C-alpha cells in the first residue's frame, strides 16, 4: 500500500512548485533557459491534468550575472540587487516563452517579507494570485530582491514558497532543487548518510545534520527543512525532490522526501499571526499566565503580564514570552504598549470598564 502522504501530493488539485536556483543553472552557475523549459514541460503536464499551479522561482540573481559581464555570483548587496533587476527580466521572459508553447500566459508577482507580514498587502497578494489562477494564467512568484536585504542572503525562496502555499490555499507544496531529498547527513560528505523518505513530524528530524546554502543560491537543507515543517504544520503536505526528476515528482510523487501535513489545516488568520506577521514587541508572562495561554488556550489578561517591550499599538502582533524569556505564543494585542504598561499585573476588577477586555483574546492567540 502506498504512502497516504504521497497520495496527497499526487491528488492535490492546487500545488505550489518552488524552483531553486541550482535547478535553473549549469554546474558553473550560468543561467540555463533550457533547464527552465524542461521544468515548464513537467509543470504543464500536471496542469493539463487539471491541477492549478503557482510557481515560486528563484534564479534572478543568477540570470543577471552573464548579461552584466560578472564572472561569479556577487557578494555585496548593491551588486546582488543590480543583478536581480537585470536577471528578473530574463527569468520571467524565459518562463513566459516556455509556457507560450502551450498557449499559456504568465504573470509576475514580486513580494518581500514585509508584503507577507502586513495584513493588507498579504490580502492583496492573495487576491492577485487567486485572480491569476481564475484567469488561467501561471503566477510566477519571486522575492523582490531589488529592495530586499536579509531576504537575499537567507532562504532562497524556501520560506516564501511555504507562505505562498498557505496564502493561496494550496493542497501541496513541491520543492525542486539539486538534491535527492532529505538525508540524516550531507551525502556528498558522508558515504553512509541515510536517506529519509518520509517525515511525519519534527521528531523524525532528531539527529539530522543540515547544511547551508550553495554557492549559486542561498537555500541550504536547513532552510528547506524549516520551510517544509512550516508548511506541514499549517496543513500543507510537502515533497522535497530533485529537479532532474520533476516529472516523477509532479505525476506520481515517487521520488524525494515527503513531509506529512498536520490533520487540521490552520486558518488563514492564525497562520498569519503564527508565521507571517512581523512582531511589534513582546509581553512577558508569569507562570500562571503561560499555563492558561498555552495549556488551556485561554485569553491573556493584564494580571498575568510582568513586562512590556516595544512600541506597539492595538491590533499589532506581539510575542508572548515566559519568565525565562522563551517565546511560548504569538497574538494580536488589544491595547497600545503604553496602556498595557499601566495595566500589567492588575486584576480585571481593578481596571476601568473600557480596559477590561483581555490583553490578547484566545481567538487571536497561537502557541508556538
From Swiss-Prot:
TM stretches of this protein: none
Domain of life according to the entry: Bacteria
Keywords: Amino-acid biosynthesis, ATP-binding, Cytoplasm, Kinase, Nucleotide-binding, Proline biosynthesis, Transferase
CDD domains attached to this UniProt entry: AAK_G5K_ProB, PUA_G5K
Catalysed reactions listed for this entry: L-glutamate + ATP = L-glutamyl 5-phosphate + ADP
SMART domains: PUA (SM00359)
Localization: Cytoplasm
Pfam families assigned: AA_kinase (PF00696), PUA (PF01472)
Pathway: Amino-acid biosynthesis; L-proline biosynthesis; L-glutamate 5-semialdehyde from L-glutamate: step 1/2
Domain PUA: 280-358
GO MF term list: ATP binding; glutamate 5-kinase activity; RNA binding
Gene3D superfamilies referenced in this protein's UniProt entry, alphabetically: Acetylglutamate kinase-like, PUA domain
Signal peptide feature range: none
Single biological process term from Gene Ontology: L-proline biosynthetic process
HAMAP family: ProB (MF_00456)
Name of the protein: Glutamate 5-kinase
Organism: Mycobacterium ulcerans (strain Agy99)
